[in-house]
Curated annotation (Swiss-Prot):
Biased composition (Basic and acidic residues): 1-10, 22-52
Claim: Coiled coil is one of the keywords in the record: yes
Family, similarity comment: Belongs to the SEC15 family.
Low complexity: bias regions: 71-93, 135-147, 666-677
Biased composition (Polar residues): 104-118
Gene name tied to this protein: exoc6
GO cellular component terms given for this protein: exocyst; Flemming body; perinuclear region of cytoplasm
Name of the protein: Exocyst complex component 6
Function field: Component of the exocyst complex involved in the docking of exocytic vesicles with fusion sites on the plasma membrane.
PANTHER family assigned: EXOCYST COMPLEX COMPONENT 6, SEC15
Keyword Protein transport annotated: yes
Provenance organism: Dictyostelium discoideum (Social amoeba)
Top-rank lineage group of the source organism: Eukaryota
Sorted UniProt keywords: Coiled coil, Cytoplasm, Exocytosis, Protein transport, Transport
GO biological process, one term: exocytosis
Amino acid sequence: MSNKKQKEEINTAGGSVILKTMVRDKDKEQKEEKREKKEKKRLEKKEAENVKKEKKKEKKELKKIGKAGRSGSITSDSSTHSGAQEFDSYGNDSNGGGGGLSASIDSNGLSSSGQPMQTRHLEKEVGEKQGIYSLSSQDRSSSLPHSSQDDQAKPLITESEIFSSESFLIAVSDTDHLGPAIKSVFENNKEKEVIKILNAYIAQKDLDIEKICGENHEGFINSVTAFLGLKGENLDLKQDVINLNYELQEIGRKYVTKAEELFAYKQIKDNIKRTKEVLNNCQYAILLGMKVDEYVQQKKYYQAIKNMDQLHNVYLKKLSDFQFARNMDYNIPVLKEKIKKLVKDEFNQWMVEIKEKSAVIGKLGMIQTSKKLLKEREINPLKIKTTFGENEQIWDKILDIPPIINSSSIGSLALYPTLNSPVTAPIYSPNSGKTPSSFGFNKQINEKDLKEDINQFSPFDESDIQFHPLYQCLFIHASIGQLEEFQAYYTLNRLLQFQLVIQPKESGQVWELFLQQILGYFMVESKVIDSTEPFLSKTTINDSWNSALVKVTSVLQELFTHCVDTQPLIAFKKFVLIFTNTMSFYSYHVQPLYYFLDTMKEKYCQFSIKEAVERFTIILERDSHCSLIIESLEEYKSLILANKLDILERQQLRQLQNSLNNNQFQFGDKNLNNNNNNDDDDDYFDEDENEDDKISKRLPKSFLFSKMVPQFYTLIKKFISEFYEFSDQLTENENFIIRSTDTLIKKINEVLYSYLTQSQAVPQVIQLVINLQHLISGCSFFKDYLNSLILGEDYQKNQSIVNETNKVILNSQNLLYTTKSHGEKLIIKLCEQKIEDLMSSAANIEWFPQNAIDDRPRDYIIDVCTFLEVTLPFISPLSQNLKEEFITKAFKNISESLFSLIYDDQLKKLNLQGVKSFDADLKYIETYVKEKANEKERTTTTSRNMVGYFVELRQLTNFLLSDNPEDFVDPKIKAKHYNLITNIPQLLNILNKYKEESKGFTTSKEIKDRNKKIADAIKKIKDSL
């Protein structure tokens, strides 16, 4: 029975195979038929196109014939006969003499060569007639259609030509002219004639056919014989095909049997394959379930959930018919719930950890930002500009500033000893009364961290914060469809932590730690948003940050009020700037903090100006007020070259050489004079003076100004550099630095003015005036520097293009000019005071000596000349006008003092010896005046004035020493020797005091005669009045 079933199945399978084979063969046949149809259509289409082309050619030929017909000529009999012969010869040659009509004429009555069939034999029967019915030329022209290209062209065939044998047949063969031809026949009732013509044409063709058949009869019989032989062979071939078909049927039955067997075996193979797949799926599902249990035990919940989803969505669905699979599928939600509880516990621990480490995270974030800012500042071209390319430590050395403890460029940002160790730092409390300088401003960042290569790192990795518990919770809650519930849970707990972060503790809190905790909190939120979007709402985080920003700003403003000098303010600003940049790096809105930082500039400038003025006051008090002596190359570079004072000194030395005509004043030690000889001065102007060997050869060297001048340059440069460092990343710095620099120089000018006013030493005041000249040049130096800094590097090249309104203007320069003028006036005033002090000692000189004295000048006049001799070299660096004014007023004061001595009312009497002593003093000062007046630097006016101040004194002294004083009244003698003595009452007063003491009987005749001459002179002078 089973064998029978198998056979039946095999037969069924074989039948199905045969059916499939037949269907496949049928499909192939259908495809081949479709392909043949398509090919046939293509060929028909191509043939139709060829027919159209041939018709077009025929039309062209007909048009040519029509044009020939319109000429009205008819071929002669001879031509007709030759045409018939041509037709016969063509018909015989077309197919080897055995063709029929179809071989020589196509369906349109044309020959195979494309020309119209000739009917000359028909014309021969009808003679030379033009047609059966002839029409007028006008009717013929109206019966045919016009050409579309030329409206005035004549018809192709006229009606008179239609009924000629040849023309009518041509018209009938052309379908385009058939209609008009037939119409004309019926209109003219010529049907019978037309029929006769056609019959004649048909008869002629029959004769032609018979003739052709007669000529090719033998060939036709041979062809029929060959065809009958071919028919017999066809029958044999048909029988062979029938036999072959039978054999194929037999072979096919065997193949069908084998096919049925193969089909049965294939079913068995498929059953085994399906069974194997089911077993493999069961095995994999069991192994995957075991893997899930293993992951759960290892706390790899993420992998466990993924495998459970794969198990549920893929494998268990395929095994839904098995009980164990249904049990496993039922336990998957239970296991997920268990995993949810476990991961939530881990998540809660993670929340506690990030709360405890928020300050550490914030601090590491600030360290990352500080390193980036430090690197940017090192490569920032503005830093090189603002530091003038110099070492800032050298500035402190020049200004005698002790090293600052907090030298860190990133503020009070110290690394914790260990990330998990507690931080001990001063406590911030609004009522603690501590200034920001005690809030940890002096803490430094680890130098190793600053010097190492600044690489971007993750603060979360450094603080050992992993976000795996959060991501795990997110995935698991999303897989069980409770993501929104977890979002609400996370948001609630983080908001509770946020409230704790922004509220300072009751016992107080380190303000840096307070900011770092806030920063750490929002860094975590930013990381969560970026890595889990759209898990958290950015709106919620931004609202939290806005509330924290209000609190932070309030705390910072309160701390800002406690800053009392620049150092804590700088450290405070740097810390806030790092905090702000870190928050900005994590995409939080920090514009209010930048506004707050901008408000610090005003206070910083106040503190910085105050400290700079105090530092300058110390410099001024410590200054030696002597010419600066440079002994080392290092000093020359840091004090002279760095401030371009060598250029200014060179210009002043050139001016000095021109004014002194190569007679330079060298002041200072004698050794300096030996070192600074003429050869050295010539070297000073060499083009290669900046080379170290050239400079070293000129050292030690003396400069006109004191050390205060390079210290002033350094102080201003340090002020500008520190301001730009403080205002890093702030806005509108240009106006602040211009205004602050101008204010600082004004304050320094006030210090100088006050110091000048209090100074009493003439050399000190002179040195200050010289220094002031260099300070004025320094203002120009810093003005050009600020212009290049603000207007760009090309300012020096394109100064003419820059608008005057855009240039930096330092009004303090005018104040320095005023102070310098004040100093110059003070020099003259102090000199006058000194001369008066020295001349005041002449009040005690003896005007009525009893004994003769020598001709030496007295001490007071020697001291005055010595003072002038010592002071004049100090005056030499000053301007020529000031020097002229100084020496002119000095000698004028001396002459006035001498006048006051001799005209003093307290002078009761004087004698000849007293006048001779005064004459010795006057000669000494006159000699000194002439010496100075003859110096080459003196102008003619100055020299004349210097000598002129003592001419009246000389005339008065000569008059008192004259043996004939009564000659004074002689106009000629007076005009020649006493023309400047115009105050007669004073002269009479002196003459009344001028007499020799009478000794009674022992008085000498000489004395008596002199007293008598004086009395006579007094009388004559009075009489002359």
